[in-house]
């Protein structure tokens, strides 16, 4: 059926059987970003946002999101994660400030952690938006993409950082 593994012979959704796959160390790193006004950037940096420390809350939200990925993405397997690490970097431009987010996830298991890394980076960005939306509803999230993955039978993947005009944060 189309070469998609998440469909059975009748074309209906199914969770892929991974019981025969070997358990190996698998990693993934995903990035996202939040584009905002300079005033919002300044208030985040100076911890002047009424809801609290934006980056600390976003970091915890990203970790929690990675752990809950299988609960919100239907065909994802629940995984025992070895680690989740979130890092932030700022870029100041003439017209805006950009918060760069990288989520790195690791497991030892039978399936990869790409979706956990993507979910983590996305939820970090959404949390920043939620905490700052009173100041700037025009914030833009993205791009969000997988930057790198290791382990598994399909081998490693590393995105050229210039492919989507994203900053290399690895």
Curated annotation (Swiss-Prot):
Q: Which GO terms describe its biological process?
A: Mo-molybdopterin cofactor biosynthetic process
- Report if keyword Lyase is assigned: yes
Supply the alphabetized keyword list: Lyase, Molybdenum cofactor biosynthesis
Q: Where is the active site?
A: 130
Residues bound to substrate: 75-77, 115-116
Name the top EC class.
lyase
- GO MF term list: cyclic pyranopterin monophosphate synthase activity
According to the UniProt entry, what is the EC number of this protein? 4.6.1.17
Pfam families listed in its UniProt record: MoaC (PF01967)
Q: To which pathway does this protein belong?
A: Cofactor biosynthesis; molybdopterin biosynthesis
Q: Which domain of life is it from?
A: Bacteria
Keyword Lyase on entry = yes
Recorded catalytic reaction(s): these are:
(8S)-3',8-cyclo-7,8-dihydroguanosine 5'-triphosphate = cyclic pyranopterin phosphate + diphosphate
Q: Which NCBIfam families match?
A: moaC (TIGR00581), PRK09364.1 (NF006870)
Listed PANTHER family: CYCLIC PYRANOPTERIN MONOPHOSPHATE SYNTHASE, MOLYBDOPTERIN COFACTOR SYNTHESIS PROTEIN A
Spell out the subunit comment. Answer: Homohexamer; trimer of dimers.
Q: Which family does it belong to?
A: Belongs to the MoaC family.
Q: What does this protein do?
A: Catalyzes the conversion of (8S)-3',8-cyclo-7,8-dihydroguanosine 5'-triphosphate to cyclic pyranopterin monophosphate (cPMP).
Name of this chain's protein: Cyclic pyranopterin monophosphate synthase
Look up and give the organism this protein is from.
Answer: Bacillus velezensis (strain DSM 23117 / BGSC 10A6 / LMG 26770 / FZB42)
> What gene name is listed for this protein?
moaC
């Amino acid at each position: 059926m189309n070469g998609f593994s998440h469909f059975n012979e009748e074309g209906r959704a199914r969770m892929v059987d991974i019981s025969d796959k070997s358990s190996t160390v698998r990693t993934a790193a995903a990035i996202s970003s939040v584009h905002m006004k300079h005033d919002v950037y300044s208030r985040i940096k100076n911890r002047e946002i009424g809801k609290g420390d934006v980056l600390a809350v976003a970091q915890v939200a990203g970790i929690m999101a990675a752990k809950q990925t299988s609960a919100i993405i239907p065909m994802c397997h629940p995984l025992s994660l070895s680690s989740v690490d979130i890092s932030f970097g700022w870029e100041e431009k003439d017209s805006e400030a950009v918060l760069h987010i990288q989520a790195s996830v690791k497991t030892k298991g039978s399936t990869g952690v790409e979706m956990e890394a993507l979910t983590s980076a996305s939820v970090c960005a959404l949390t920043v938006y939620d905490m700052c939306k009173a100041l700037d509803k025009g914030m833009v999230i993205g791009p969000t993409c997988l930057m790198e993955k290791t382990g598994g039978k399909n081998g490693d993947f590393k995105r050229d950082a210039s492919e989507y005009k994203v900053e290399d944060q690895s």
